[in-house]
Amino acid sequence: MCLLFNRVVDMENPERHTVYLVVSLFVTFLSNKNSTPTDEKANAKKQSLVFRHFNTLLGYSSTEKCFTIPPARLRKAAVCNAFISGLPEILDMNLHTGNQLLPTVAQLLIHLPSPQKLASDQNVTNYSLALLTQHTRHLWLQSLILILYKYRFDQLPVSEYIVRLIGIVVKTLQNQVHECSDAADQSAEIDTWDEIEDDDVARAELIRPESLTVTTIQEATPAAEGMVHIGAVCVMQPTIVEPEGLAPEPLIARKRSTAVQEVRRKKSAIEVVKKSCTLRCGHCNEAIEMFDEETISLCLIALETFLHREPSMAAPILFKILYTVTRLIDTPMYPWHSTEMFVPANSRSVAKQMLRVSLHHLSTSAICLQLFDTKIPRPDAFWSVVALSLADFPELSPVYFIQILMEDLEESWPGSVKLIMKNLAFYIVEIPTDMYNNPWKDLVGHLETFFKRYHSAISADNGITPTRAEIENVIIVMTHVFKVQTFSSSKSPVTLVEAFARWLSESLHSADVSLESLLGVCTACNRALIRERDKQCITRALVTELMQAIKFKVKLHESNYVTIANMILQDAGEDIEVPLLDDQFNTAASEAIRPFLFEVLDFIADLHVIAKLKKESNSDALGGDLKVKLAEAIAVEMSRSNARDCRTVIRFIPWLMSPPSVTQAAPSAFADSVTNVRVLSWLLLGALHANHSCLPVPIECSQHMADYIHFVLAGFADQSKQSVVHMSALFHAFHLCQLWTVYCERAATYSSTTAFAHLVDFWARVTPAILQLLSHSKVLADMVNLHFLNTIQALQQVNSALLCQLYSMWAPILTAYHSQIPNQLRMKLDSCQNQPSLEAPLVTEWLKKVRYKISQVELQTSAASPYYTV
């Protein structure tokens, strides 16, 4: 055998068939179990010598432990092809010989598909099997699978070789489902035809049948034979040779040599054309490679075998493997791949089986926790494929996969669950809620334990507070769990809801939550449970947290105050400024706030709450926005009764029915009246923000409203210097007049026929009090004139019908103290008279301005009250 190998030392031996047969005979010999040498040293020495000769023939240097022949040349060698053809049989049939050849075989498998040009070039680590022919690829993969299945590879240097081989397999699968890399050079340029050298064009010229010419053989110099000169370019013109009679033997040999050279030229031209016509990605300019289904299936089998044999070695590239497999499943090669049917020998079916078997095998090694705690590109597609693969796998159902995650979290709680919740939200929405009834029931208990642990983690002194995205993802998870058909029949659904509600209430302290998320989870809970009290568990927890926040016992995130208030108004059927894609929500929040309505009234009446909220949130608008939202909720509740009497007024604001008398007022009556005027202003603001049918204060109470304003105006001259609160009484009284006017006019438009008459009577009672206030002093008259002119301007902005009727009566008020209207007021009055509105007025814009003014006055009054006392 050694002598035979010595005869075959030329890699480009013309007798390639003979070389192939010789090596095939040697491979057949090695695959025979009886070829294993005995214990005799002589036979072992001879076999070692044979292997050394064969390694030399393959171009492998035993001293340098590397190949000295370029991969491209080795791929064409008959010796290599013959050896690769029988390599799987050797590895399968003769383990003793396979173990001896294993290091060399592993290096050969690494070197063979390499794209490096020279053997001395630096080894490339990121390449696929694209350079191998289809048949060679199959043999290559079969050999690798046998090594992974039958041989030990946990020791150096074989372990390093195996890792590199697995990298080649992974790269092959990645190239099959090409994905542009972020690190790819987007400015990569594709060579144009003008940049290709002329000699390359000549060698790459396509051979067409119509370009062939029939010539006779003539005596010619080899240099000129078959050459056509076109300018400076020498182009080879193929010829078909027809002999003329008999030719001498040297001429026949020369013809044979010419024919061989012609075939080589054609093959070289075809290879150049293939390289020039590579299919590339239009975005990143990387080559796009396509492989047959058997190659892909063999790659998947090799990866699964590797994961099963040595999971510790696969750990560094485990996610890359799983992600690539999911990309294969998500990218069908043929139309029938898109169906859910399991097709044997189908690469997509093999990939699904490989994915779920791998996850099941590694489920006891905390693979769930590691996978969910990994940043995944395109997580929606990834988790959709995982759920699809586990759908018909009894050993590991999609729901049981989540249960394993919960068990892993119970054993080892991570520093942050933000990424886990994000991936879990993408995964759980892919699981149907009408299947896997028993696994869903088992999961409820684990989720309860999870939220108890989660609540303890974020409520600790040094705990990591959840972000908005984290809260939103948890809400998505729980909303989907609530939609499970058998949720109410689980072992402890109520305790899970309570644990989640406590966590959600605590989370609202640190991050904002969207209104739609809160509406969705509260509605899902309302529909999932059976008992009425249990249905409102989450809603009641949110409303209670808001009530604790307005008492300043807890601190919510700035935007969550208004968000929870909007949730209450939405449930009451009111229009809110937040756009909602779906309005089919039922949270029962308007019912949950009913026990706290009197506490809400106290919050509205408190002069200092806006200043306190500003300190917590650094926002001037938060206090006013929250007050008007809660005032709207009270107004809606007060107007819910269909009775035309004043029973709701007596229940909520009984002091309105008994205004103080000017002659028999207590010392604190003026301060209380100013507070009541502010409360009435906020209630009317809330009612005007609500729908048209919202009338919390009956129109018949117009007389009592006028009596309160009359009392404040009558006592302002004497009480205004007592405190800062008293100083703002005039401002609040005139704004209440404006709001009551707009309130009555809207009622006259939509519901009440007597509203306008009551409004005229209201101003008939208030106007004398204004005239009486003008008689005190010039300074006070200027203040009253300014407020009264602001009232006229405000009524003009809302296009008040009352202004047209009473303006002639009001004009003398402006000159009651002065002989004529002062200049600073004249300009403002002229602007009102000379600029009539040509468009329909927007009452909402005016309400926003009034709301802002009232809140700013309360803020300034609260800030100045500690420093101004008499």
Curated annotation (Swiss-Prot):
InterPro entries hit by this protein: UNC79 (IPR024855)
GO biological process: positive regulation of locomotion; response to anesthetic; response to ethanol; response to toluene; response to xenobiotic stimulus
Gene Ontology CC terms, in alphabetical order: axon
Protein known as: Uncoordinated protein 79
